[in-house]
């Protein structure tokens, strides 16, 4: 019987990758589990997508090590493979912020994460579609969104979540509301918004938290969160209290829905982030979901 094959994609510039030694431990665990391991290190942005798409069909499992951006690239590559030929995917978090890993309790220790992935049953997860691109856990715009792709990598590596907060707070006085018409499963929201997210995660940029009871990763639905521009002191107070108390579901200052399909219409391109990766936006964007589109070893 042929050995199973595992492609190990490593981003050596990821925030917490101080040494590759722990990754050798993870590779040994995969080998002990019966996999022939092939390692590829990325050298430029987008290479994880290229590797996953071109080599993925030859492997049973594709593992990536890096931050959420590396995971996003890898999943985009895998999702370009016809569904019947898609390999399983696994993730060893090593970035400065790892929201997806936090949501699914994936250990930051490569050996522990690898051992868990080899021990537990694979799990099917929903995958988002933002225009022609995929996202794993969040598509967002507005406040703090620009921060995720403008903070220099070296600063992210040192300060992690705090780097995002510092840069976001620095820009609070220049926040510009976005005029948008958002249609979510037939319900229309037409107004000005400071922030918006379509997510499948309990953690967004390490700053906003949803309870595990609110989020299901395989139900064919996303969580839509919109922060309208507060027009009155009472609305501002409601917004501040909701953010402080992390009560996004029951606040009059926020819009929260479980949705399957979203259309966003604007008069201008609005920059967005997909799992922390920059997207230039477009005047009309269709956001959908492929239910159980990805099978992951967690």
List PLM regions with ranges.
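ATP/NTP phosphate-donor binding region
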Residues: 1-65, 72
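Short Gly/Thr/Asp-enriched flexible loops that form oxyanion-binding sites at enzyme active sites
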Residues: 70-83
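Short hydrophobic-aromatic micro-motifs
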Residues: 133-140, 145-146, 190-200, 204-205, ...
């Amino acid at each position: 019987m042929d050995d199973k094959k595992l492609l190990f994609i490593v981003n050596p510039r990821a925030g917490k990758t101080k040494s590759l030694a722990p990754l050798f431990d993870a590779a040994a665990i995969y080998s002990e589990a019966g996999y022939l391991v092939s390692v590829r290190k990325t050298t430029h942005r987008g290479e994880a997508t290229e590797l996953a798409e071109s080599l993925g069909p030859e492997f049973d499992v594709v593992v990536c090590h890096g931050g959420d951006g590396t995971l996003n690239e890898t999943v985009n590559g895998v999702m370009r493979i016809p569904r019947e030929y898609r390999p399983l995917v696994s993730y060893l978090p090593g970035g400065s912020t790892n929201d997806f890993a936090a949501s699914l309790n994936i250990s930051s220790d490569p050996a522990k994460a690898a051992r868990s992935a080899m021990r537990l049953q694979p799990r099917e997860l929903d995958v988002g579609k933002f225009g022609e691109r995929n996202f794993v856990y969040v598509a967002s715009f507005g406040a703090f969104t620009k921060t995720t792709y403008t903070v220099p990598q070296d600063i992210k590596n040192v300060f992690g979540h705090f780097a995002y907060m510092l840069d976001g707070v620095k820009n609070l006085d220049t926040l510009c509301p976005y005029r948008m018409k958002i249609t979510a499963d037939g319900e229309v929201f037409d107004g000005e918004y400071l922030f918006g997210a379509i997510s499948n995660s309990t953690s967004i940029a390490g700053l906003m938290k949803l309870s595990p009871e609110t989020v299901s990763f395989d139900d064919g639905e996303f969580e839509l969160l919109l922060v309208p521009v507060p027009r009155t002191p009472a609305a501002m107070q409601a917004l501040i209290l909701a953010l402080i108390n992390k009560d996004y579901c029951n606040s009059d200052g926020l819009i929260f829905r479980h949705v399957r399909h979203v259309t966003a219409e604007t008069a201008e391109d609005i920059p967005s982030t997909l799992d922390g990766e920059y997207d230039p936006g477009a005047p009309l964007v269709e956001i959908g979901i492929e239910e159980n589109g990805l099978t992951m070893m967690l």
